[in-house]
């Protein structure tokens, strides 16, 4: 990791925290406000998702019941661990929830792992192709974390309607937790409760990865003789953080769906 000599410290940080943007109004590489697509986030997340699917597909095709290889062992351990976690939290049909949980955990972990790549490596490669800004950590972008949390929210609503029906869900919203006589308060509490879930889910992941990325950038500004030591210490700690954050996002998704699927 090294800083660009032509930039001040503030400019260096700003440069590495800026996205490769596409203005959806006129399809130019400018800031379009709300109608801006962060191409770097899209590219890295899609590539990592495709890599995840490809690796699992290849190993599934080569899976053997005799003596499994190291990759097969690792994936079987991950699948069993996630399935066991889902089984403890979700007591209905796990045919959709377990694969969803596994996908979320692996995909979020891979996107988080990009935070451990040297901060100048990927931006420099894209600079050679004429791209001035490139932010390589998708989960440090709130647009992606909110997109994922909103998708989880849609699944929660779907399970609410699927398990309780429109009438049953309506009764639950109007009567819980304070009974029928306080219906307006019940509705307000329910709206707040449901609205906070995707917001907290998105901000928790974004905040941790944004802070981690910023610290790596600040370490890159230090003298070369201190970068390695501090970088290694923070990398070891951050490896735990990215794993825990992927697990928390997966776990909360399962819990929210489980709560929605419960019949009262």
Swiss-Prot record:
Its main location: membrane. Key component of the proton channel; it plays a direct role in the translocation of protons across the membrane. It is found in: Cell inner membrane. GO terms for cellular component: plasma membrane; proton-transporting ATP synthase complex. It holds the Pfam family ATP-synt_A. It is a multi-pass membrane protein. The keyword Cytoplasm does not apply. The keyword Transmembrane helix applies. One of its GO terms (molecular function) is proton-transporting ATP synthase activity, rotational mechanism. The chain crosses the membrane at residues 39-59, 97-117, 139-159, 205-225, 239-259. One of its GO terms (biological process) is proton motive force-driven plasma membrane ATP synthesis. The lineage of its organism: Bacteria, Pseudomonadati, Pseudomonadota, Gammaproteobacteria, Legionellales. Signal peptide: none annotated. Keywords: ATP synthesis, Cell inner membrane, Cell membrane, CF(0), Hydrogen ion transport, Ion transport, Membrane, Transmembrane, Transmembrane helix, Transport. This is ATP synthase subunit a. F-type ATPases have 2 components, CF(1) - the catalytic core - and CF(0) - the membrane proton channel. CF(1) has five subunits: alpha(3), beta(3), gamma(1), delta(1), epsilon(1). CF(0) has three main subunits: a(1), b(2) and c(9-12). The alpha and beta chains form an alternating ring which encloses part of the gamma chain. CF(1) is attached to CF(0) by a central stalk formed by the gamma and epsilon chains, while a peripheral stalk is formed by the delta and b chains. It comes from Coxiella burnetii (strain CbuG_Q212). Belongs to the ATPase A chain family. CDD domains: ATP-synt_Fo_a_6.
């Amino acid at each position: 990791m090294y800083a660009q000599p032509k930039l001040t410290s503030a400019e260096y940080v700003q440069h590495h925290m800026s996205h490769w943007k596409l203005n959806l109004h006129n399809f130019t590489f400018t800031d379009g406000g709300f109608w801006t697509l962060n191409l770097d986030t899209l590219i890295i997340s899609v590539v990592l998702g495709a890599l995840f699917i490809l690796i699992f597909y290849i190993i599934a095709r080569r899976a053997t019941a005799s003596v499994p290889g190291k990759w097969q062992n690792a994936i079987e351990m991950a699948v069993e661990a996630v399935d066991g976690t889902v089984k403890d939290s979700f007591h209905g049909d796990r045919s959709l929830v377990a694969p969803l949980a596994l996908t979320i955990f692996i995909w979020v972990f891979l996107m988080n792992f990009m935070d451990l790549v040297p901060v100048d490596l990927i931006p420099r490669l894209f600079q050679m192709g004429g791209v001035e800004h490139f932010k390589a950590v998708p989960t440090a972008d709130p647009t992606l974390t909110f997109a994922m949390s909103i998708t989880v929210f849609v699944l929660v609503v779907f399970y609410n309607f699927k398990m309780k029906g429109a009438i049953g869900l309506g009764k639950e919203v109007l009567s819980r937790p304070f009974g029928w006589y306080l219906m307006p308060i019940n509705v307000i509490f329910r709206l707040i409760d449901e609205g906070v879930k995707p917001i907290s889910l998105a901000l928790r992941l974004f905040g941790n990865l944004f802070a981690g990325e910023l610290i790596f950038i600040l370490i890159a500004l230090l003298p070369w003789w201190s970068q390695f030591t501090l970088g290694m210490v923070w990398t070891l700690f951050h490896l735990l953080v990215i794993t825990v954050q992927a697990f928390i996002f997966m776990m909360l998704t399962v819990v929210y769906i489980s709560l929605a699927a419960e019949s009262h």
